[in-house]
């Protein structure tokens, strides 16, 4: 589709705009469209008719606020009311009422949905567009076989193929194929109409024998043969109306409904003029498709590229919500139909209010948001993650591909992706290439196509004209890359420019160019656009960087980057993490939890987010940045959020880094850091953990929350208040009781104490027994209690329990085992924390903060980190911040290098420090060993890059096990930290132990610590008393399991033990 925009300069669109537009499209178009499809429902006697009057539907403003929905774990939704009427046909009376259809979840200002107190987001899906596609394959004889695949709107596929004898078949499933003449006749065409509407009638007549002519005598015979080959189970079918209905349901509705997009694609591919409202496959389509297939056989026409974006469509949030709404209305129709029949049967007078229930719509959307693969929990690790998550594109999901069956060709970059799908940003692992990210300027067109903007170059007019082009159109234009940030008509363009034309990259004269790109970032996603000097990095490392920026933890003291790209402010603004002034006014009061200002004659209070937990356990917090008494304008930033400074994204820290080896502590991507990062809280972050407990009403009585827990030490209960809940502000350690709870249970007579039995015998008092089921703080959960929520729901029962949430704040400094990364894919694990006096230091006496391995740069080809490192050093000394767009070599050769060296030279001049820029080795410096004070032999690259602390922290991963649960079948320890599992000693680990000859350690690993049941029971008691651990005599359980599995295959395996002294052979039974 080709659209003309305004004639002014382009601005970066809102990053959440696609989500907002999709939801608005659903409310404005999808909702009434599905309501209009709701049929009129009659009872069995056709005396009463129920129908909806769609013209007067309305959505009511939510009764609860978004903040309360999060607090109470409710859904932020709106009630849908529609006018409905009952028409009594006998008396021609109409009873009309406004009824509640159900609740529809609403999208909030972040572009997300709030379902059961959890932020969820619906991501976009890429599907094969319905229509017809021609392709060619080689058979086993090496001969080209041409096929035409018809894809329906529901994803069903039918194929047309032509064999060696020029016979044309329709394959409606993988096994059955029928003649094209049978299919056309079954769809309503006779032989004369078929021959009159095709270009090659002689080919159709060439394989038409006498039997076929008899079958084509009537439509009934063709339908019978089609049914017999496609849907018949056995026997000879007889033509009937039920047979036609079954065929209609099994074949035509699933594989012949094209939809609006399919009809447009079919008309365009086959040069047809069938009306757009005719969305089903017609005999005319089949015949035209057959003509094109015959033309392909004769070398006429072009084959289709299935991976081209013009053959794909985007299934947005509007389509997904509309599909679920239609499904809910079908369920509602069945409910209304059954209720009407039941009311008439029991001689009751129904009303529209009694016939309709809100359950189908509400439950349909709850199951969709909870179970659908494209509905995901919003990743809120940092502000960047929130935006990027809503701009994902997935080939996976219902109707799409799977990670194990998708080919390399589908995963690869296609020329049609440029300006629409980022060639860098995708997931790593099995889903690589299947989950992508939208480019910054891409938008979704009316019929699901991805559009990208371009500037139109016109010799006649000096005005700038911007066009949005779909993938099917821009390949016919010569598209060049823009060579400047702004269109300056006074710049003399180069004579020869690189351009794109018909999926090829060419070098052409400037006069031949039709369109030009509008922005250097146009081809990239948000994550890739935040990488400075990305053009100097290998694409694989840029991919890692764009993924790792989403894993950065918000720090307690954020700092914006010295070297950036200019998109940091837009990313922070669209994330919703900032507090923005809605209109101009004056600040009256400000503190940590609110800002009060006056404007337009009113006094408004803006609440600030304080220590709110994200679903990744990071801390979301807002800090006011406007002082009291200052006047503000509309749109001005009032408060910074987590990982933002001055309204710009601030995910990491600018620290002093040296690229050099240091005693092997930075071997294989390990990182050496200074203790200054710990003591000065440079990389300190706050994390909030949530612990839940629920109270049920059991068969023995309700569970009780109390502080009086018998048989527990008073030390564990010290933080509980009189209600049995931990106090706010308490410091809790591992094992402390957070919520005291007792669960009643029925005890056996033998379990009563003697005094309890005496009371029962003499006084008849029933002594109640209860079990302690308290909420205890698990290992690694120590911290400060910052919030406690007791959500009491009405009518507490086993199905509607009360819930208590306890939130604990942890302060985590950086430590050995944490993961850090730069913005160029340079990641590493902290290996050692050195005292600052032992760190290498510069010629001005400053010790470096971090030491990276220089061998991590050449082989990985991410040279951008060197440019950022050196430019950051100059910016830190000159107190400057740089915002550099990618591909600055379009101005001149070596532009990046010249910029870095000129800034270093200027910093050296202003600070009178010649070591900052040494002409012999520019960018490097001679530094000293902090332990000895000696110079290192070689000059070293030093600088101030932007380093992030990632969410992969050692506190979440360190794990130890003494004894625990074992698998039932193999009797080996379970796997995983969550299950208190053991550490696996695999095949290669056994080889390593064998190589060192540690036989006893190897025996312990394979027997006592693993699956030898008797030996692992004996070893505990022997260790406690200090005895000698006995040698296991029989085989471990895994060997016994192998023998049993072989026996199930009728293979007997015997094993023997040979005595070390007498060499006697003893047979052992498994």
From Swiss-Prot:
DNA-dependent RNA polymerase catalyzes the transcription of DNA into RNA using the four ribonucleoside triphosphates as substrates. The lineage of its organism: Eukaryota, Viridiplantae, Streptophyta, Embryophyta, Tracheophyta. It is found in: Plastid, Chloroplast. It comes from Silene latifolia (White campion). Its main location: plastid. It is an enzyme of class 2 (transferase). GO terms for biological process: DNA-templated transcription. NCBIfam families: PRK00405.1. Pfam families: RNA_pol_Rpb2_1, RNA_pol_Rpb2_2, RNA_pol_Rpb2_3, RNA_pol_Rpb2_6, RNA_pol_Rpb2_7. GO terms for cellular component: chloroplast; DNA-directed RNA polymerase complex; mitochondrion. In plastids the minimal PEP RNA polymerase catalytic core is composed of four subunits: alpha, beta, beta', and beta''. When a (nuclear-encoded) sigma factor is associated with the core the holoenzyme is formed, which can initiate transcription. The keyword Flavoprotein does not apply. The gene is rpoB. Its EC number is 2.7.7.6. InterPro entries: DNA-dir_RNA_pol_bsu_ext_1_sf, DNA-dir_RNA_pol_su2, DNA-dir_RNAP_su2_dom, DNA-dir_RNAP_su2_hyb_sf, RNA_pol_bsu_bac, RNA_pol_bsu_CS, RNA_pol_bsu_protrusion, RNA_pol_Rpb2_2. This is DNA-directed RNA polymerase subunit beta. GO terms for molecular function: DNA binding; DNA-directed RNA polymerase activity; ribonucleoside binding. Belongs to the RNA polymerase beta chain family. It catalyses: RNA(n) + a ribonucleoside 5'-triphosphate = RNA(n+1) + diphosphate.
């Amino acid at each position: 589709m080709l659209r003309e925009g305004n004639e002014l300069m382009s601005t970066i669109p809102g990053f959440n705009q696609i989500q907002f537009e999709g939801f608005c499209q659903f409310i404005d178009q999808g909702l009434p469209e599905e309501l209009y499809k709701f049929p009129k429902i009659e009872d069995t006697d056709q005396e009463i008719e129920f129908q909806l009057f769609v013209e007067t539907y309305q959505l009511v403003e939510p009764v609860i606020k978004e903040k309360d929905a999060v607090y109470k774990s409710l859904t932020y939704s709106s009630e849908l009311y529609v006018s409905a009427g009952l028409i009594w046909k006998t008396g021609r009376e109409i009873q009309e009422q406004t009824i509640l259809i159900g609740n529809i979840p609403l999208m909030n200002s972040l572009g997300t949905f709030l379902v059961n107190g959890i932020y969820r987001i619906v991501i976009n899906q890429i599907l094969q567009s319905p229509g017809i596609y021609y392709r060619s394959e080689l058979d086993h004889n090496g001969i080209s076989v041409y096929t035409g695949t018809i894809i329906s709107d529901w994803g069903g596929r039918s194929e047309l193929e032509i064999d060696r004898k020029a016979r044309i078949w329709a394959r409606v499933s993988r096994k059955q194929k029928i003649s094209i003449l049978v299919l056309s006749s079954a769809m309503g065409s006779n032989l004369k109409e078929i021959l009159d509407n095709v270009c090659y009638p002689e080919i159709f007549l060439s394989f038409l024998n006498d039997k076929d002519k008899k079958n084509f005598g009537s439509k009934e015979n063709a339908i019978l043969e089609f049914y017999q080959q496609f849907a018949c189970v056995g026997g000879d079918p007889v033509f009937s109306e039920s047979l036609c209905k079954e065929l209609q349901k099994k074949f035509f509705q699933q594989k012949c409904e094209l939809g609006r997009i399919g009809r447009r694609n079919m008309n365009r591919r086959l040069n047809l003029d069938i009306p757009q409202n005719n969305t089903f496959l017609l005999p005319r389509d089949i015949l035209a498709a057959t003509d094109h297939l015959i033309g392909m056989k004769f070398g006429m026409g072009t084959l289709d590229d299935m991976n081209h974006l013009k053959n794909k469509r985007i299934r947005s949030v509007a389509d997904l919500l509309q599909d679920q709404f239609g499904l809910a209305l079908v369920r509602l129709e069945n409910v209304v139909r059954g209720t009407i029949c039941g009311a008439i049967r029991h001689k009751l007078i129904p009303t529209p209010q009694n016939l309709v229930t809100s359950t189908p719509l509400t439950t349909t959307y709850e199951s969709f948001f909870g179970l659908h693969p494209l509905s995901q929990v919003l990743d809120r690790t940092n502000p960047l993650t929130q935006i990027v998550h809503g701009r994902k594109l997935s080939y996976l999901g219902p109707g799409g591909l799977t990670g194990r069956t998708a080919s390399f060709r589908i995963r690869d970059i296609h020329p049609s992706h440029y300006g629409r799908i980022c060639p860098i940003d995708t997931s790593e692992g099995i889903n690589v290439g299947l989950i992508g990210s939208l480019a910054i300027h891409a938008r979704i067109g009316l019929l699901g196509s991805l559009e990208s903007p371009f500037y139109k170059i016109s010799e006649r007019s000096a005005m700038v004209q911007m066009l949005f082009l779909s993938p099917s159109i821009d390949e016919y234009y010569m598209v060049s890359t823009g060579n400047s940030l702004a269109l300056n008509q006074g710049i003399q363009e180069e004579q020869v420019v690189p351009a794109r034309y018909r999926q090829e990259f060419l070098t052409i004269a400037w006069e031949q160019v039709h369109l030009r790109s509008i922005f250097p970032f146009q081809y990239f996603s948000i994550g890739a656009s935040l990488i400075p000097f990305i053009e100097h990095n290998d694409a694989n490392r840029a991919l890692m960087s764009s993924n790792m920026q989403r894993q950065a933890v918000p720090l307690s003291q954020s700092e914006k980057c010295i070297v950036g790209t200019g998109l940091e402010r837009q990313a922070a603004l669209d994330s919703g993490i900032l507090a923005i002034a809605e209109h101009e006014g004056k600040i009256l009061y400000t503190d940590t939890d609110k800002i009060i200002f006056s404007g337009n004659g009113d006094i408004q209070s803006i609440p600030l987010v304080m220590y709110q937990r994200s679903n990744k356990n990071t801390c979301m917090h807002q800090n006011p940045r406007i002082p009291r008494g200052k006047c503000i304008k509309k749109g001005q930033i009032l408060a910074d959020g987590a990982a933002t400074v001055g309204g710009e994204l601030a995910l990491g820290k600018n620290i002093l880094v040296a690229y050099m080896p240091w005693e092997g502590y930075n071997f294989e991507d390990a990182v050496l850091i200074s203790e200054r990062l710990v003591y000065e809280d440079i990389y300190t972050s706050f994390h909030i953990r949530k612990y839940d407990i629920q109270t049920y009403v059991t068969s023995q009585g309700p569970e009780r929350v109390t502080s009086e827990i018998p048989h527990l030490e008073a030390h564990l209960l010290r933080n509980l208040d009189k209600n049995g809940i931990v106090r706010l502000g308490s410091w809790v350690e591992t094992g402390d009781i957070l919520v005291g709870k007792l669960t009643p249970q029925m005890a056996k007579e033998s379990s009563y104490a003697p005094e309890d039995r005496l009371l029962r015998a003499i006084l008849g008092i029933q002594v109640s027994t209860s079990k302690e089921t308290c909420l205890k703080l698990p290992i690694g959960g120590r911290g400060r209690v910052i919030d406690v929520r007791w959500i009491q729901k009405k009518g507490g029962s086993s199905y509607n329990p009360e819930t208590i949430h306890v939130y604990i704040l942890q302060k985590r400094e950086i430590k050995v085992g944490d993961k850090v990364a730069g913005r160029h894919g340079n990641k590493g694990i902290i290996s050692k924390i050195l005292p600052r006096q032992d760190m290498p230091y510069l010629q001005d006496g400053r010790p470096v903060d971090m030491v990276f391995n220089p061998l991590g740069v050449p082989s990985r080809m991410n040279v951008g980190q060197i440019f950022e490192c050196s430019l950051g050093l100059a910016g830190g000394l000159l107190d400057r911040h740089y915002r550099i767009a990618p591909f600055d070599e379009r101005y001149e050769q070596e532009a990046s290098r010249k910029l870095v060296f000129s800034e270093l030279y200027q910093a050296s001049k202003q600070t009178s420090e010649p070591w900052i820029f040494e002409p012999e080795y520019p960018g490097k410096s001679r530094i000293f060993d902090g332990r000895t004070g000696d110079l290192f032999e070689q000059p070293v690259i030093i600088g101030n890059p932007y380093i992030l602390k990632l969410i992969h922290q050692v506190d979440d991963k360190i794990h130890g096990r003494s004894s625990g649960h074992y698998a039932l079948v193999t009797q080996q320890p379970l796997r995983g930290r969550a299950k208190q599992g053991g550490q696996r000693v695999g095949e290669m680990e056994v080889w390593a132990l064998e190589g060192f000859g540690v036989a006893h350690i190897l025996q312990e690993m394979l027997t006592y610590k693993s699956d030898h049941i008797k030996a692992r029971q004996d070893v505990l008691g022997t260790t406690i008393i200090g005895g000698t651990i006995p040698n296991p005599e029989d085989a471990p359980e895994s060997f016994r399991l192998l023998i049993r599995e072989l026996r199930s295959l009728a293979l007997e395996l015997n094993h023997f033990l040979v005595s070390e002294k007498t060499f006697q052979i003893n047979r052992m039974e498994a």
